[in-house]
UniProtKB/Swiss-Prot annotation:
Keywords, ordered alphabetically: Lyase, Molybdenum cofactor biosynthesis
Subunit structure comment from the entry: Homohexamer; trimer of dimers.
Membership in a protein family: Belongs to the MoaC family.
Name the UniProt record assigns to this protein: Cyclic pyranopterin monophosphate synthase
MF annotations from Gene Ontology: cyclic pyranopterin monophosphate synthase activity
Annotated HAMAP family: MoaC_B
Hydrolase among keywords: no
One Pfam assignment: MoaC
InterPro entries (alphabetical): MoaC (IPR023045), MoaC_bact/euk (IPR047594), MoaC_sf (IPR036522), MoCo_biosynth_MoaA/MoaC (IPR050105), Mopterin_CF_biosynth-C_dom (IPR002820)
Function: Catalyzes the conversion of (8S)-3',8-cyclo-7,8-dihydroguanosine 5'-triphosphate to cyclic pyranopterin monophosphate (cPMP).
Length: 170
């Protein structure tokens, strides 16, 4: 059926059987970003946002999101994660400030952690938006993409950082 593994012979959704796959160390790193006004950037940096420390809350939200990925993405397997690490970097431009987010996830298991890394980076960005939306509803999230993955039978993947005009944060 189309070469998609998440469909059975009748074309209906199914969770892929991974019981025969070997358990190996698998990693993934995903990035996202939040584009905002300079005033919002300044208030985040100076911890002047009424809801609290934006980056600390976003970091915890990203970790929690990675752990809950299988609960919100239907065909994802629940995984025992070895680690989740979130890092932030700022870029100041003439017209805006950009918060760069990288989520790195690791497991030892039978399936990869790409979706956990993507979910983590996305939820970090959404949390920043939620905490700052009173100041700037025009914030833009993205791009969000997988930057790198290791382990598994399909081998490693590393995105050229210039492919989507994203900053290399690895």
């Amino acid at each position: 059926m189309n070469g998609f593994s998440h469909f059975n012979e009748e074309g209906r959704a199914r969770m892929v059987d991974i019981s025969d796959k070997s358990s190996t160390v698998r990693t993934a790193a995903a990035i996202s970003s939040v584009h905002m006004k300079h005033d919002v950037y300044s208030r985040i940096k100076n911890r002047e946002i009424g809801k609290g420390d934006v980056l600390a809350v976003a970091q915890v939200a990203g970790i929690m999101a990675a752990k809950q990925t299988s609960a919100i993405i239907p065909m994802c397997h629940p995984l025992s994660l070895s680690s989740v690490d979130i890092s932030f970097g700022w870029e100041e431009k003439d017209s805006e400030a950009v918060l760069h987010i990288q989520a790195s996830v690791k497991t030892k298991g039978s399936t990869g952690v790409e979706m956990e890394a993507l979910t983590s980076a996305s939820v970090c960005a959404l949390t920043v938006y939620d905490m700052c939306k009173a100041l700037d509803k025009g914030m833009v999230i993205g791009p969000t993409c997988l930057m790198e993955k290791t382990g598994g039978k399909n081998g490693d993947f590393k995105r050229d950082a210039s492919e989507y005009k994203v900053e290399d944060q690895s």
